[in-house]
Amino acid sequence: MNERNIIETQPERTDLPLIVIPVIVESMIEPFAANFPLLHDIARIRMHCDFTLDTDTILERTKDAEAVIVIGFHITDDILDAMTVRGHVSCFAFGGTGVASYINLPVARERGIRVCNVVHYGDHAVAEHAFALIMELARQVGRLDAQVRRGDWSGIDGIGLHGKKLGLVGFGGIGRTVARIANGFGMKTLVWNSHVHGIDGLDITLIDDMDEVFAQSDIISLHLPLLDGTAGIITSRQLDRMRPGSMIVNTARAEIIEPGALTRRLQRGDVRAAIDVFDHEPLPMDDPLRSLDNVVLTPHVAWRDDEACVNLTRQVIDAVASYFTGGDYNAVP
């Protein structure tokens, strides 16, 4: 790779451990670079300022690394073996919260590999994207724009949100932020969560039975983390409770839904969805979701806004600095 596309600090300090960012999205280059001075005399860092999902390229770029900052790609079992068994990587710092779908955590733990994540860095970003998807389902602005551009002035009837029931499955930082936005729209918010610690003065109704959230809501928004107890927690049973005309939004993790269940429900054609997260990313060209006109798709970008990028990059750099100085900041247990 051309040297102009690499940013490297303290290259002469071969006594220091090497951190590599093998791929990155353009909007994150400057925020990351701004935090590199925090690693002075702690570690060298090498950032490749482009984005690729080519495994061979990623492995070549990380062959001398002791820590890898992971942005936008999965650490498959093959990559994990290459980096930690045949390579020297002892720490992965992920630019995201839910890492269970990005790396085999049990294997990493067994090998003594540190895995770090970032927390609450983009609660507002994800919540705003979730609500943007809700608005798109309700008002179909994208389709209206396409209509006008092709000379069609017929329009589409929208769906008003005031007074509608929004069901939140999950009520952490993101879910609470969505609830605040929904309160501003005058929506009635129903919440299911395994544990709710205070409602922060929000106008919400707690529902003990998740099935009832699906049955009663006009719009459902998912905000559960991916944990051992949440993988596949939403099944065809809940999805079948959705009323005709209702909508579901997922900006959390695809794996919290039983594999294939949402696609099958959408193929019946009487409900709509907006999805930002998928079982396989990038979404394969032959995925049946691509052929459905009752679903809005975005490429796992709910977390990506200017403020979230600043928060994320600082936490990632702090995590690797902590690792190399004996701390455990943002270490995934």
Q: What do the PLM-derived regions correspond to, one by one?
A:
Residues 39, 58-61, 85, 212-213, ...:
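Structural alpha-helical scaffold elements that stabilize or flank donor/cofactor-binding regions
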